[in-house]
Amino acid sequence: MAGLAVAALLSGCAGSGATGPGAADPGVAGPGEAAPSSSAASASPAGAFPLAVSSCGVDATLEEPPERIVTIKSSATEMVLALGAGDRLVGTAFADGDVPAELAPAAADVPVLAEKNPAQEAVLELEPDLVYAGWESNLSADGAGERQTYQDLGVATYVSPSACKGAEHRPERLTFDLVLEEITEVGRMLGEDEAAAELVAAQRAELDAVVPSGAGLTALWYSSGEDVPYVGAGIGAPQMIMDAVGLENVAAGVQDTWTSLGWEAVAEANPDVVVLVDAAWNTAEHKKEALERNPVTATLPAVQEERYLVVPFPATEAGMRNVPAVTDLAAQLAELEVAR
């Protein structure tokens, strides 16, 4: 079922707007979770321009739906593609992996500016009216340039709200409500309100259909690192996804999105399953080998019995691939034989 929500949306986009080539209720904020944040965009009526938006404390105004969009990070690129605005992408950068198959045709002819952050000059040469980034650091002096510089030149910028670093802007805990709220907000910014509403409805339905097959099991979300593993902690997308499938995160007590966790702590936690993040630069297979040759983890039952779940890196950051990742992990869990 992974990807069905997006596929259903794409099949229904032909008649809407601009066309382009292509363990509680996990969707509701619970105690201690951040309620969906309000913004100028989400408070404005659909199709209302000029449109004021704010992300990570930076305000911008879109006089009309952007026609020349640059995206940085897969999460931003895939959001624009999924909302049917791929024909307005004039450049992308910092791809974390291949786009989902159903979005590939829409992405095929979009120019790639850089493997990581592009130079600000390269972005400005494209004369964008919107630069949309998945990380706050993408739009910084060390990234593709400061947001203020773009603003001074009349270019609107937007950063995924879940990626805000300032405590006053960062969600206390990521929820599916917040992820779906970003879809709605970006849809409004692009003038693709109908497409956004369809995607949100499809993803809510897909999420509601998930059976939490990991109930009663503990898990380590292993992202990278061999000397010291870098793992999913208690307030980001990994925690949100594990909650949705019923898994108990062994690093849930760390109030951060990601954290370093010593191998001895991993061994002491003795997780029932290990979620392996599959990235081109650090594959799931490489992580399996690292776990099997590390004397601290080699004797863990989860390693010896290969109780592994695999999730692609682009699905580990807040965005439209989180719900399909839940569906996929639930299916993988259903196939594992783990004593409870």
Q: What do the PLM-derived regions correspond to, one by one?
A:
Residues 96-98, 231-259:
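Alpha-helical, coiled-coil/dimerization segments enriched in small aliphatic residues
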Residues 73, 135-138, 162, 277-281, ...:
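Short secondary-structure boundary segments
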Residues 1-77, 185-222, 332-340:
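Bacterial Sec-exported substrate-binding components of ABC uptake systems
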Residues 173-182, 273-340:
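Structured C-terminal subdomain patch of bacterial secreted/periplasmic proteins
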Residues 68-126, 130, 135-139:
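A short, structured surface patch at a secondary-structure boundary
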Residues 120-133, 263-279:
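Proline-aspartate-enriched helix->loop->beta-strand connector
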Residues 98, 137-145, 155-185, 216-239, ...:
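Extracytoplasmic ligand-binding site segments that recognize negatively charged/polar headgroups
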Residues 53-57, 111-121, 141, 254-263:
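Short helix-initiation/N-cap motifs at beta->coil->alpha
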